[in-house]
Amino acid sequence: MLTIEDLKLKIDNNSRLLGLDIGSKRIGISICDDKRTIATPLKTVNFTNLSDFILELKKIIDVNNIKGLIIGYPINMDGSFGKSAQSINDKSKIIDKEINIPVSLWDERLSTSAAFNISSQLDVNISKRTKNIDEKAATFILQGAIDYLNN
């Protein structure tokens, strides 16, 4: 896995990226345009096991000509690393070994709550807010990373 700075060196300016918000039951997936200006939700997949998810991820990467992967890293609010961060780190290492594109972790603190709050500001009802929260969180994660990469 690469730091976000090393990922920037490995990809060119016209590279599409994927963002992942990996949960215990669902994985939110987002994608950005080839100019890396805006991230948009792509889909949410039910998580059964990592092997099946990696097969689906490889298809998404191939179909969309993806050049890099940003995975949300759930660091605790105090900056420490808990069980969730360790779980994501372990899964990310396996994903990194199985796919042929650079992978980087991105601090996802508050991504799910931010996605939920944005939905509420758009006056979306509670059931619709929670329905696609994972892919919205993945979008928030990816947007933060591409904003950083573009500066």
Residue ranges: model-predicted function:
Residues 1-18, 25-151:
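Phosphate- and other anionic-substrate recognition elements at nucleic-acid/protein interfaces
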